[in-house]
Amino acid sequence: MSPRTWQERLEDILMCARNVQDFTAGMDFVSFLDDPRTIRAVAFEFTTIGEAARAISDEVRERYPEVPWEKMLGIRNVLVHEYFRVVSLLNVVER
């Protein structure tokens, strides 16, 4: 299997972001917290976003400083290593 290009990784990020918007459309904070399926789906998408961002080279990241690379990596780390902080997901979704 050939490695994915940074452009393909960026497409993955954009697709996951659209999925998060679709999954949470019309939800408020309470609705989100009461829906474990949506919580898990959103967590998976954010984890995927973080993994895709991590695979993009520093050179590419430096070319696009306006992209919140560190935030993408950070949310992935929270989800993987501090999974008990899931409530912070909706704050990210709302932005």
Where are these regions (language model features)?
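Solvent-exposed interaction patches of small proteins and small membrane subunits
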Residues: 1-95
